[in-house]
Amino acid sequence: MVLQLFALAALLFHPVTDGSESNLRQDSAKLEKNFDQKLAWNWLTKQCDLGCRVPGTDAHLKCRDLILEETKKNCDSAELQPFGWLWSKTNKRVSMWNILGYQNWENAKTRVVLLAHWDTRPSADEELKPADRKKPILGANDGASGVAVLLELMRHTKSVPKDLGICYLFVDGEDLGPGLEEMFLGAVHYSKHLKSPKPDYGILLDMVGKKDLVVPVEPNSLELARGLTLALFRHAKEVDLAKTFPMEQGPTILDDHLSLNDVGIPTVDLIDFEYPQWHTLKDTPEYCSAESLGKVGTLLETWLKKSTVWKPTAKF
């Protein structure tokens, strides 16, 4: 789950500009675009077919194993990062796992962490009926979508030049709740237990699967990772994705990216929060689309192929 900060007038959209042009601009139109939106969609539905992936359930364990198996296939190495939490709702310890996969990591010149949460919300807080609020959500968009993009993307980034190292990070416990103090748990754990070498920057995917996807600039990302955010959204324009990734601000979001920014990893949050099915029982594949997954995957695939030595300190 993510949260809007209404007190910061987050819903006042306005254009974002930086007054500079890229010194590293290439002919992005010629970059290979191999991301398969149909295969990404299959990953979304496979997760949903397992049921609600709430920590402590069989569906959660099956999803962990599904992601880990595919990560092992496509990465040089993969590992589980276990952690636990004494959950206020049950007063019992809940076991959770981050899942990490590395490509070209040790000897790379630039390292990026790509992350998404794989758990789903235990309670449909936004439902109107009190009885429905106690039920878990399926999380087709809020959970499965970001994971689906990354699982398909990692097939293609194996061929990225060795100068770029990639960590695929699937975080758990993002949406446990019900309060903020019991959310974003996997990202917090990862950030507190960083191993060397440290990522140079990060890109978070959250709620990127809805139909007619529009991902604006997230204000916390702009403040904390300005160079990365502007460079990525300029790249979206270069690859004809400006309608999906417009250079204008959206709502301010509390999300996993804040924990990474807190430990010095500039990280951008790619999220479309205008989703009426958020934290309801209607967060199902019916309201998502393969096309949206394809646009996000294409953005990242072309960015990674183009920007193999890019760092947040570079002028871009």
Provide a role label for each language-model segment.
Residues 86, 201, 210-316:
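Active-site-adjacent substrate-binding region
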Residues 28-34, 48-59, 86-90, 132-143, ...:
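Second-shell loop/turn segments in exported
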Residues 36-46, 50, 59, 63, ...:
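Stable alpha-helical elements in mature extracytoplasmic
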Residues 53-55, 84-86, 105-108, 118-122, ...:
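Solvent-exposed loop/turn segments at secondary-structure junctions
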